[in-house]
Amino acid sequence: MTDSAQSEAHASAALPLSVSARLGRLQFHLSGKFRVLQCADVQDGLRISQDTIRLIASACDAVRPDLVVFSGNQIAGYEKVFAKTFQRRRWQESSNISASDKKQLVDKVHEFVAKLMKPLEDRSIPWVVTYGNHD
């Protein structure tokens, strides 16, 4: 294990955890509280900014949420990389989008979500994503 990987593993082991993260299931605190951190309108591209990742990580460390909800518009779907599959209006017929283009889009979205959720995965924090009109 490299020094940086070892340092990262040690740092993540020392992260503050919520009750839910410690128990491995969603759980109210004895006080009756349940902390939800909501994030919305990240609107980042496939090359997600490290500032965004650090902000999410810092918010999780400060709040120690039991659940993080990303409530729409995480992906800047209007970026050039999505041009082949972007629909301006959902109710309009899509142009002939190939199966290959659709698969590439799904792969890109999965890659983006994995990067965005890494701070939560590192902290064992449950999360949920809903998509918005830019995703």
Residues of each region from the PLM?
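Mobile, glycine- and charge-enriched loop segments
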Residues: 1-50, 56
